[in-house]
Amino acid sequence: TAIVPETRPVKPKDGTRRWTLADSGLLSLAYVWRDRFNSKKKGEQRYLELRDQVKTQDAAVFKARTINAKPRKYAHRTHASVATQPWRGLLSLGTLATDETLVAIGQSRHLGGGLLVPHDVSKDDFERMIQKEKHSNDK
């Protein structure tokens, strides 16, 4: 199932890296677990802070990529500045959930989409994915 970002991308400032689908995925997790994360900040600074709080729970998004689909099929309403951009990826929920947690994320959850489907990954493959993610974040 596809996920639709809940916000527009955060604009890079002062040499920061650009906002990615993975960042959108982490922010979506913050919105689902909103009782665990909060921020007094506004706008883009809020998005960045919430994303960073989710990262402290060892949550991560891997292999995020857009899909070619009818975008309006996945979101009922978005702000004019938010592109309806369906995407898929592998998410690790870290300490946010157990192996039995059922969760849907993103704008698409309002229409019955965004459901996370379990996908087993070997420990070795998972560790490689973590290393690759760390390496790409260092750039």
Where are these regions (language model features)?
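RNA-interacting cores
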Residues: 1-139
